[in-house]
Amino acid sequence: MLAKRIIPCLDVKDGQVVKGVQFRNHEIIGDIVPLAQRYAEEGADELVFYDITASSDGRVVDKSWVARVAEVIDIPFCVAGGIKTAEDAAKILEFGADKVSINSPALANPELITELADKFGVQCIVVGIDSYFDKETGKYQVYQFTGDEERTKATKWETKDWVQEVQKRGAGEIVLNMMNQDGVRNGYDLEQLNMVREVCHVPLIASGGAGEMVHFADVYKKTNVDGALAASVFHKQIINIGELKEYLAQQKIEVRR
């Protein structure tokens, strides 16, 4: 059995790490490089960096910090934000990232997934999906431009359908960002993850809702995800990654130590 991954997520805005609640009201957490170093030292398996306003601003990730991060950590990391072309992706990978993640640009141009997978290999290509449960319709809907409160909008895609579509086009991994749970810290949406897992045949990473160690145990025991991504519990030092791994190992969950 493959070890379950613990993945801190760093939302980047104007060169600093920020964190919001349900994708709104972002506060500054700190500088990118020291945080990346801290998480690598604590035992994170991987890091994910989202330049959260790149897509809505119509620009690509600022690459200067990508190279600085690559210099100071020795674990894999993934970078997302406004990657619209193979050239954009190539530059980020050249600067030292191990994977690139696309979200809004994939919705605007689904062919991009195939192009990147063909050029760099599926193992490098992650698709982020921002999924919102609409209580009125009872459906999970994919949202776009979620880094900008004024531009964020529902797309025509239901979550399950988009998960199937991106796999057909060459996504090597899917990060499911569950918007209703984001930053609220009351647990992952296990029902949604199980629904997505039924149609997801590539590694699936849960994102949104971690508040205490038991939430990680629950998501691994009850949904068969490959990894769990979290932000505020790590940024605010509510949970230490080393201690989390000890706890999960005691719960008979396979983790890298």
UniProtKB/Swiss-Prot annotation:
> Which sites are catalytic?
11, 130
Function, as annotated, reads: IGPS catalyzes the conversion of PRFAR and glutamine to IGP, AICAR and glutamate. The HisF subunit catalyzes the cyclization activity that produces IGP and AICAR from PRFAR using the ammonia provided by the HisH subunit.
User: Pathway, per UniProt?
Assistant: Amino-acid biosynthesis; L-histidine biosynthesis; L-histidine from 5-phospho-alpha-D-ribose 1-diphosphate: step 5/9
Any idea of its EC number? 4.3.2.10
Its assembly, as annotated, is: Heterodimer of HisH and HisF.
What Gene Ontology molecular function terms does this protein carry? imidazoleglycerol-phosphate synthase activity; lyase activity
Reactions the enzyme catalyzes: 5-[(5-phospho-1-deoxy-D-ribulos-1-ylimino)methylamino]-1-(5-phospho-beta-D-ribosyl)imidazole-4-carboxamide + L-glutamine = D-erythro-1-(imidazol-4-yl)glycerol 3-phosphate + 5-amino-1-(5-phospho-beta-D-ribosyl)imidazole-4-carboxamide + L-glutamate + H(+)
Q: Which family does it belong to?
A: Belongs to the HisA/HisF family.
What the entry lists under CDD domains is as follows:
HisF (cd04731)
> Does the keyword field hold Lyase?
yes
Gene3D superfamilies the record matches: Aldolase class I
Q: Which UniProt keywords apply?
A: Amino-acid biosynthesis, Cytoplasm, Histidine biosynthesis, Lyase
Biological process terms from the Gene Ontology for this record are:
L-histidine biosynthetic process
Recorded hits in HAMAP family, A to Z, give: HisF
Species source reads: Aliivibrio salmonicida (strain LFI1238) (Vibrio salmonicida (strain LFI1238))
Task: State a GO cellular component annotated for this protein.
Answer: cytoplasm
Domain of life, per lineage? Bacteria
Name under which the protein is recorded = Imidazole glycerol phosphate synthase subunit HisF
**Subcellular localization(s) per the UniProt record:** Cytoplasm
